[in-house]
Amino acid sequence: FMGGLIKAATKIVPAAYCAITKKC
């Protein structure tokens, strides 16, 4: 379960960072 959670986070974090900072 933790492995899947980390895998999802690695995909979500860059997208959120991109949306917030407008740096893509």
UniProtKB/Swiss-Prot annotation:
| Keyword set, alphabetical order | Amphibian defense peptide, Antibiotic, Antimicrobial, Disulfide bond, Secreted
A Gene Ontology biological process in which this protein takes part is: defense response to bacterium
Give yes or no: UniProt keyword Disulfide bond.
yes
This protein's GO cellular component annotations are: extracellular region
In which tissues is this gene expressed?
Expressed by the skin glands.
A Pfam family assignment: Antimicrobial_1
Keyword set includes Secreted: yes
Source domain of life:
Eukaryota
* Disulfide links within the chain: 18-24
Q: Where in the cell is it found?
A: Secreted
The job of this chain, per UniProt, is described as: Has antibacterial activity against the Gram-positive bacterium S.aureus ATCC 25923 (MIC=3 uM) and the Gram-negative bacterium E.coli ATCC 25726 (MIC=24 uM).
The family classification in the record reads: Belongs to the frog skin active peptide (FSAP) family. Brevinin subfamily.
Full protein name: Brevinin-1PTa
| Protein's organism | Pulchrana picturata
